[in-house]
Structure formats: C-alpha cells, structure tokens
C-alpha cells in the first residue's frame, strides 16, 4: 500500500456511504477501512469528495502551508470520527460530527499522502 493509497483508504469516502446517523457511520467506516485493529485509532476524518478534487490541493487548488503541507482553497464536506472512552482496545465505539471546512494536507509527488487537519 502506497502512502497515497493509505490516504485514500483512511480519508476519502465519496459519495458518502449511507448510514442512519454519524455514530453508525463512524463505527462502520472505521472498521471497514481497517482503523480498528490492532488498536482503535483515536480520531479520523473522512472527506466526502473525489480523489481527483482532493488531489488538486497539491496543485492549483491549494496554497503552501509550510513544508509539504498545503491548504485547500475550496471547502469540503467532512465527517470526523472520535473514539469514545479512553481505551484503544476493540471493540471501538465512535461518535461522529459533520462539517464543511477547508483542509490541510501533505502532498508528495503531486499526490495527497497525509491529512493534517480542518482549517
């Protein structure tokens, strides 16, 4: 798995997978995308946009933010999943929140390889 492929697996869900609520969405998606074993990842953000549109941040759709980080000029629909309780041992139970924000990512060779944060 390349760094780009890992970015896609962990952070891109487009179109957004249907779920009755954000809690169910997060519990399903975190498990489905391999972020609940061997330990539960504390927090993770899914971007509901195409890989192509996110990749533009590495070029004309983004501005330098220091090092290999770039800030998107556009806003994206996001779902952020946060682990409930202190234990990182499965079963993992997540709560989720949705927002529309600009994002900061790291690029390598013109491709997104790391999600830094919403800005």
Curated annotation (Swiss-Prot):
Biological processes, Gene Ontology terms = defense response to Gram-positive bacterium
Task: Provide the residue positions that the database annotates as binding substrate.
Answer: 6, 9, 41-45, 82
Q: What EC class does the entry list?
A: lyase
Q: Catalytic activity annotated for this protein?
A: an [RNA] containing cytidine + H2O = an [RNA]-3'-cytidine-3'-phosphate + a 5'-hydroxy-ribonucleotide-3'-[RNA]; an [RNA] containing uridine + H2O = an [RNA]-3'-uridine-3'-phosphate + a 5'-hydroxy-ribonucleotide-3'-[RNA]
- One Pfam family, short name please? RnaseA
Molecular function as annotated in GO: lyase activity; nucleic acid binding; ribonuclease A activity
Q: Where found? A: Secreted
For this UniProt entry, what's an example GO CC term? extracellular region
Q: Which UniProt keywords apply?
A: Disulfide bond, Endonuclease, Hydrolase, Lyase, Nuclease, Secreted
UniProt main location, coarse: secreted
Cysteine pairs bridged by disulfides in the record: 26-81, 40-92, 58-107
**What InterPro entries does the entry give?**
RNaseA, RNaseA-like_dom_sf, RNaseA_AS, RNaseA_domain
Question: Which EC number(s) does UniProt give?
Answer: 4.6.1.18
Tell me which residues this entry annotates as catalytic. Answer: 11, 114
Assembly mode: Monomer. Interacts with and forms tight 1:1 complexes with RNH1. Dimerization of two such complexes may occur. Interaction with RNH1 inhibits this protein.
Q: Which family does it belong to?
A: Belongs to the pancreatic ribonuclease family.
Its annotated function is as follows: Endonuclease that catalyzes the cleavage of RNA on the 3' side of pyrimidine nucleotides. Acts on single-stranded and double-stranded RNA.
Please identify the protein, giving its name as recorded: Ribonuclease
Identify the species of origin. Answer: Chelonia mydas (Green sea-turtle)
């Amino acid at each position: 798995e390349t760094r780009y492929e890992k970015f896609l697996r962990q952070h891109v869900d487009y179109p957004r997978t249907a779920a009755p609520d954000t809690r169910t969405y997060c519990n399903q998606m975190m498990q489905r995308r391999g972020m609940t074993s061997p330990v539960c990842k504390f927090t993770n953000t899914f971007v509901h946009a195409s890989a192509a549109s996110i990749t533009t941040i590495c070029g004309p759709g983004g501005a330098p933010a220091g090092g290999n980080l770039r800030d998107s000029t556009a806003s994206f629909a996001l779902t952020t999943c946060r682990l409930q309780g202190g234990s990182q041992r499965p079963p993992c139970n997540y709560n989720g929140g949705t927002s529309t924000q600009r994002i900061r990512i790291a690029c390598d060779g013109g491709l997104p390889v790391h999600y830094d944060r919403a800005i």
